[in-house]
Amino acid sequence: GEYVLLLNPDTLLPETNITEVLEFMDTHPDAGACGVKMLAPDGHFLPESKRGYPSPATSFWKLTGMHRIFPDNPRFDGYYLSRLDENAVHSVPVLAGAYMMLRRKALNSSGLLDEDFFMYGEDIDLSCRITEAGYKNYYLPYPILHYKGESTSKESYRYVRVFYGAMDIFFCKHGTHYPLLYRWMVRAGIKLQTWLKLSIVFIKKHVPALYADRGKCEPRFLIFSSEKNMYSIRAICQSNQLNESHHYVISNERSTVAGHNLLQKENFGGFTHVVYDSSVFSYSAILSLLSQSQEEKLLLGIYNPKSHVLVTPERNYV
């Protein structure tokens, strides 16, 4: 094939996504890889959708939080490039491996994913090699949903070791042009950061009272579905002992164009998730509606009548 798509299993793509990305690559022969606008389950934009080159200085400003304090300053915003409009096309140094459309010619020139990495860092490494091969990495503002991080808990020793191990591998591979003493200092900093993160994980596991979940409650769903599938969703809630007062709205994409956004903000109180029936709402419409209410922090649930499964970020209900 002419193109190769790297795609995480914890993603949801609108019906026209792949076609739109391929059309862009067909009209931009300099595009070696394309990434897209990734949304979290509550609709907010995931900044790792477009990233800068992770130099030691760039990584330091990220770790110290300076990129949040000065988001529009190029000096401090080199990691997430938040000064670049998330709703516009940009040529960027690094794309996320959760969704990466690759031109096979570029992949043949740059080489495949480096097996020295495991789970983290290989997308950054590949992005850099595609650029070195003479192609560009493009960020496209076409939204997809990324549940993100369900495969590995960030509160685990394994995550910390693998994540910072990948950082060390990347620097050893791409940082050979730095002076020896500087390289030693950077690697020592990575080891120190690993130790600090492992210590935090240890404390969280052994002193749970300090990090107990506050305000954690049973899911309460705001459900938009066809009348036919409403009974199936009710049955799923009952069989999983979801006893909160859920709200059901018989609707479809045409009759309820505004979806859950038709409610006044004060009426969102108490709901934790908005659930859409995928047989009457397209994925494109669902993501559009979710992004319009991201400040409400409602998590997205999707009911698939073909599999009779209700998918949420936390778990799947059958």
PLM regions: where:
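Short aromatic/hydrophobic "clamp" motif used to bind/position activated sugar donors
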Residues: V4
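The conserved acidic donor/metal-binding loop of glycosyltransferases
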Residues: N8-L12, S278-V280
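Conserved donor NDP-sugar-binding/catalytic core segment of glycosyltransferases
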Residues: L12-E48
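Short, flexible, basic/aromatic active-site loop/helix in glycosyltransferases
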Residues: Y53-V92
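A short, conserved alpha-helix in the catalytic core of glycosyltransferases
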Residues: L84-A88, P93-P143, L289-L290
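Active-site-adjacent helix/loop segment of glycosyltransferases
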Residues: C128-H206
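A solvent-exposed beta-alpha-beta segment
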Residues: A212-V309
